[in-house]
Amino acid sequence: MKRKWERDLGLQGRMLFTMFLLAAVYLFFLAFLSYSGTPPVFMLLFVGAFMGIQYFYSDKMVLWTTGAHIVSESEAPQLHDMVTRLCVIADIPKPQIAIVQTRVPNAFATGRSPNKAVVAVTTGIMDKLTPAELEAVLAHELSHVKNRDMAVLTIASFISTIAFYIVRYSLYFGGMGGDRRRDGGGILLVWLVSIAVWVVSFLLIRALSRYREFAADRGSAIITGQPANLASALMKISGLMDRVPSEDLRKVEGMNAFFIIPAISGSSFMDIFSTHPSVEKRLAQLEKMQKEMS
């Protein structure tokens, strides 16, 4: 049975405001590059090609990076049954399902659209969670698929990536041309503005990522009708992460942005640099939803 996908207007408002700020920063940056005489065509083409590959082949890249193995219904019947049932409720096509052989208890989703998605779980999470908790985690990942989060964040980071490459290479290549910038002062100005744009956009993209994690948590609660199950799973995963050997955690640290909980997380002081909200904030939202649904 399909469930109504109710909107959280406050969360949507924060996401839209963040995207508005991001767009404003990007428009300023493009206007500045045009005024300074910087020909951004080459950089646009280079970064566009790079991000196009990421956009269209992200699922294959992530599977290769993690060593995830696509499993058939005969190989993982219970997992397939769970995902099939959740997809009917969420009203999305069933994605491919993969398993990663690692003790790290985690899960992730990738793919540019609901029709080209992969949802993966680790053997660590399958061994430790109850069926209800695992179902809640899968519903969280399917919410990312339904919300097209991979596509949104790839597009959002496009100009930020251009700013990063200008910062990295402009001093080496004399600012990449442009009449107004042939002097050292002009090159330095472009470099400084690019740094500012990259830092601001980096923080905004991280904020957008955290909001979309909140949205996926909310989606899981709506799909399963049991926010407490995801809350229980998050607490269990967070606690289990401390018991996993640091060597195993470092192997998958590059996948933190995709995981339901980062394999290695910093202090609360570093929250503004994190792709995920703190577990405490996520639990507070789920507790509020549990009360609303009771």
From Swiss-Prot:
Gene Ontology BP annotations: proteolysis
UniProt cofactor(s): Zn(2+)
Superkingdom as given in the UniProt entry: Archaea
Record EC number: 3.4.24.-
Active site: 141
Keyword match Lipoprotein: no
Bilayer-spanning residue ranges: 15-35, 37-57, 151-171, 185-205
Annotated residues for binding of Zn(2+): 140, 144, 213
Entry's family note: Belongs to the peptidase M48B family.
Listed PANTHER family: PROTEASE HTPX, PROTEASE HTPX HOMOLOG
Name listed for the protein in its UniProt record: Protease HtpX homolog 2
Organism: Methanosarcina acetivorans (strain ATCC 35395 / DSM 2834 / JCM 12185 / C2A)
Lineage: Archaea, Methanobacteriati, Methanobacteriota, Stenosarchaea group, Methanomicrobia
Gene name for this UniProt entry: htpX2
